[in-house]
């Protein structure tokens, strides 16, 4: 690049965030080698992609944590975190058994390999579900007991803590993305104004995902407190 002016401005960005003006500092005389628009856009796109993937994963983790906490109604997701020692290897219960809900207050675990019944029973007993399995030699039945008022309040606190952990994870994603933008600024690929604008756009996206966590939390809390 050669120019008489101190700065060269180029337009970049067509992704999720708004189109921005990139300001590249340049000496008044001589030639300055700088990144192309395509290279800058590629780096920004990678940051956006990473942010999106990590935020979606955070929401999935929050949902999985909530699903593992039982309410008074039967739900196969309650068994998501149970690992069974299957031929010496910790294995997800759902991968070795069919789980169904005969009614609103019970679960039926039907192993594909009947020899794993005792191991499945042991895994359920050792879990924090607080449910005693009934092994009839063919399937395992789980009767979901009603939650006491104190237990509902206790579980509500656990869910609230998990929701807050999800929000912290989202804020950490924002922090990491801003560090990446700051790095591009130091490399003269983005101006200070670019970084401010991108950070502002990013905050709006994070705020939307925090609202998702709040919505999921309120729904789970409602389930827990419903008698």
From Swiss-Prot:
Transit peptide, UniProt annotation: 1-34
UniProt keyword annotations, A-Z: Chloroplast, Coiled coil, Plastid, Protein biosynthesis, Transit peptide
Coiled coil ranges: 167-212
UniProt main location, coarse: plastid
GO biological process terms on file: plastid translation
Family membership: Belongs to the RRF family.
Entry-linked PANTHER family: MITOCHONDRIAL RIBOSOME RECYCLING FACTOR PSEUDO 1, RIBOSOME RECYCLING FACTOR
Protein name, as recorded: Ribosome-recycling factor, chloroplastic
Organism of derivation: Daucus carota (Wild carrot)
């Amino acid at each position: 690049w050669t120019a008489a002016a101190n700065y060269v401005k180029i337009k970049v960005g067509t992704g999720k965030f708004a189109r921005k003006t990139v300001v590249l500092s340049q000496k008044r005389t001589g030639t300055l080698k700088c990144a192309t628009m395509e290279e800058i856009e590629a780096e920004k796109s990678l940051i956006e992609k990473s942010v999106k993937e990590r935020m979606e994963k955070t929401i999935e983790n929050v949902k999985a944590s909530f699903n593992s906490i039982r309410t008074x109604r039967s739900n196969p997701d309650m068994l998501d975190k149970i690992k069974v020692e299957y031929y010496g290897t910790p294995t997800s219960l759902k991968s070795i058994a069919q789980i169904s809900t005969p009614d609103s207050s019970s679960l039926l675990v039907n192993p594909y390999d009947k020899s794993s019944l005792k191991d499945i029973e042991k895994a359920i007993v050792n879990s924090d579900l607080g449910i005693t399995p009934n092994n009839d030699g063919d399937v395992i039945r789980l009767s979901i007991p009603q939650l006491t008022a104190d237990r509902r309040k206790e579980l509500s606190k656990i869910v609230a803590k998990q929701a807050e952990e999800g929000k912290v994870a989202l804020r950490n994603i924002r922090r990491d993305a801003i560090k990446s933008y700051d790095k591009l600024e130091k490399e003269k690929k983005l101006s200070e104004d670019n970084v401010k604008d991108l950070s502002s756009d990013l905050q709006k996206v994070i705020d939307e995902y925090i609202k998702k966590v709040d919505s999921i939390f309120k729904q789970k809390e409602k389930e827990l407190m419903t008698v």
